[in-house]
UniProtKB/Swiss-Prot annotation:
It comes from the Eukaryota. Residues 17-39, 49-62, 315-339 have a biased composition (Low complexity). PROSITE patterns: CAP_GLY_1, CAP_GLY_2. Transmembrane segments: none annotated. The gene is Clip2. This is CAP-Gly domain-containing linker protein 2. One of its GO terms (molecular function) is microtubule binding. One of its GO terms (cellular component) is microtubule cytoskeleton. Its main location: cytoplasm. Residues 355-525, 564-637, 677-1017 form a coiled coil.
Amino acid sequence: MQKPSGLKPPGRGGKHSSPVGRPSVGSASSSVVASTSGSKEGSPLHKQASGPSSSGAATTVSEKPGPKAAEVGDDFLGDFVVGERVWVNGVKPGVVQYLGETQFAPGQWAGVVLDDPVGKNDGAVGGVRYFECPALQGIFTRPSKLTRQPTAEGSGSDTHSVESLTAQNLSLHSGTATPPLTGRVIPLRESVLNSSVKTGNESGSNLSDSGSVKRGDKDLHLGDRVLVGGTKTGVVRYVGETDFAKGEWCGVELDEPLGKNDGAVAGTRYFQCPPKFGLFAPIHKVIRIGFPSTSPAKAKKTKRMAMGVSALTHSPSSSSISSVSSVASSVGGRPSRSGLLTETSSRYARKISGTTALQEALKEKQQHIEQLLAERDLERAEVAKATSHICEVEKEIALLKAQHEQYVAEAEEKLQRARLLVENVRKEKVDLSNQLEEERRKVEDLQFRVEEESITKGDLETQTQLEHARIGELEQSLLLEKAQAERLLRELADNRLTTVAEKSRVLQLEEELSLRRGEIEELQHCLLQSGPPPADHPEAAETLRLRERLLSASKEHQRDSTLLQDKYEHMLKTYQTEVDKLRAANEKYAQEVADLKAKVQQATTENMGLMDNWKSKLDSLASDHQKSLEDLKATLNSGPGAQQKEIGELKALVEGIKMEHQLELGNLQAKHDLETAMHGKEKEGLRQKLQEVQEELAGLQQHWREQLEEQASQHRLELQEAQDQCRDAQLRAQELEGLDVEYRGQAQAIEFLKEQISLAEKKMLDYEMLQRAEAQSRQEAERLREKLLVAENRLQAAESLCSAQHSHVIESSDLSEETIRMKETVEGLQDKLNKRDKEVTALTSQMDMLRAQVSALENKCKSGEKKIDSLLKEKRRLEAELEAVSRKTHDASGQLVHISQELLRKERSLNELRVLLLEANRHSPGPERDLSREVHKAEWRIKEQKLKDDIRGLREKLTGLDKEKSLSEQRRYSLIDPASPPELLKLQHQLVSTEDALRDALNQAQQVERLVEALRGCSDRTQTISNSGSANGIHQPDKAHKQEDKH
């Protein structure tokens, strides 16, 4: 039955055979299109048509990610063996050399030898060696951070997107899907693009989560691996508020015992861990790092990706949507099918009268419709090809965008790491320089102490020499006294011999007295005439007393000399040990300073090597990125140019991409302008700071110059005063010389008197011997007197018997002869006694005269000693004044050293500001950078010339002071008595110390010149580095890093 329009129902249209011999696919697609022309989008027929295609696409896409997930699981959970090649965090290649537990942290660890020197050790940690490798190529990591293949950017999501697009193309060519309305083509295409970009971004974020540090992510969970303070790694065990402080805190169990607690603070436990492994830190100081061993964030992200892919594959027939868009683009310029049918129906109604003509016209129209349907199928196939090509191009563009973003992120991350390394090296360099300065100060202090100890040692040596000289003099005097004692002993022995001879003579006299009685009366008369024996002389007692005093004084001097010698020997030993200790410490500190210098040099070389490596890597990344962009342009230019419409659509797409790129470039340019403005402000601020520092430095230099001039004038006045004092000392020294001559004359007189005293003592000894002999002779005279009385009695008896006995006349004559002889001997003895008395009186008179002379000389000696004491006091005062002048000169040299150190410190701060200015100038545009560089060079030359002039002036002043000091020292040497070696040694030590101070000041001036030259070389090097950095386009990450540091 026919409709009122005269056409057959659409259900029978499928019975016509294809006149061109189309395949079944074309007929099926035509029947579907014919059936959908009269039905709506939400009809059951439409749902049946779209259902199989979507389910098939979903099945195709959902079956693909299975092997990929299994492969990734094997990479993370597979068993690693020693010698296997792996990648640490997916970016650092190396070979496994150790698997197992370690002593520095609990759990399982993997030791890897990296290909590049970007590690942390040489296989040994904490003094324990686990494997052997070169320095900075060994690293210890968790096995969960190792992969058997390098991690590529956006690998998983790109695979899903490619598979989904493949499924769409298959469904498009199969023709099983029904296209929806044309009004949904543009937003669905945008959704496809957004989904592809989103998956690319998710893949990039997944890579960054697995292989690098996420800076802005503060969503921390229990079990996440984090980095605390930029140096300490660990696992999150607690997140929330605490009792010991306000705000959000994060409790971390560290990998190494570098913490402060065991999870409990102030009696409250927040988590459990070993001691020294727990650490609490604010959340803003904690950064989450990749490969969390127990973190659920990875599972959530993979689940979210899987849901995104499944949603994309299960969406209502994305292939049919693309086919509908192509149909809409091809049918938009020609009449629709419904209009064509109405036209044929109107023609058929006008010619209804002729059935034959109508049937022919109907056949023609039917053929025309079939021809149009065939053309429509061909165009649809071509549009499907074009859309697939566009999808591929969009996919490639998305991949290139993701790769570009990944390259930019990696470059920024590497640059940030390089900056952190440079900053750490700078800090270490500053710390090492500070330590070097401290060690240098310590060494200078030790040198000063060693010099002082050497000076004191010289003084002690001079004192010991003086004491030795005194000991020698005392020994000589002792030898003289011993010689005198021996001489006195010999004289005593001689006197004893003389007394023995006298005794023999007395015995002979007794025999003669017994023989001759006649001499008894004469001897008695002589004895009566001789007076009583004289008393003992006081001169002998005085001489004995003086001798005892001399002996006691010699003993005391000997005892004091021995005590002083022992004391000074002990002090000399102690000072020698202290000097040895100081010398050993000085050598030790010198060795430590040399080691620190070597470490600083090694750190600087390693820093430069790392900077060169990072620059080469950045250059290679930039060249690879440029090559990829050129390849993309080549592929876009070399596409198929069969039809004008496809080229137009591609051009429109490219124009849209160009517009997006222009918008991004505009945003980047605005951002760059903002950063350049900020850098300009920073540069202005740095210039102002530099100008202020320069003004301050100029003021300080002027102040130091004035202070130096004042000190120089003060030193000149002090030197003038010292010269006046030296003149006074010269005059006093002349007086001392005159007094010394007088003292020497008095000493000679005293020696002469001592000799006379010794002679008088000898004579007194002789006198004593004579007195003893006289006493003995008196005793003998007494005995003779008794005998004489006996003889007188006998004579009286003889006289009474004279008359009776005449026979005895002859005997009496004999007795008279004997008495005559006895009288003669007694007279001889009396003469001898008179002579001895005269000699004794003469000797006593001489002793009195000598005593008077000795007392006068003693008075003169006392007055001379008083003068000598006063002159010695004056000499000590002059020496103290000279020592004060030398101390002032030493203090002036110390102030010069301090001023030179201050100059070095100010120059160091000025160089730091200049480095900051150079870094700021490096990011400025070309002409402005050149202009600032020229200005900086000119300022640098001016400052360098000023520093050289200052150094030259300081050297001239130092040489002038050295000359004045040498003149004053020469004058001082001319004024001082050459016979005083301690003063000469002391002044020589002072001269050596002042020369050392001047030499140190000159060395420091040379060091300042070397620093100026080194800073000039550093400025040239930084300029070349800034030129290379600006040529490679690295300044934008530097600015971003600076802004992050400011925030």
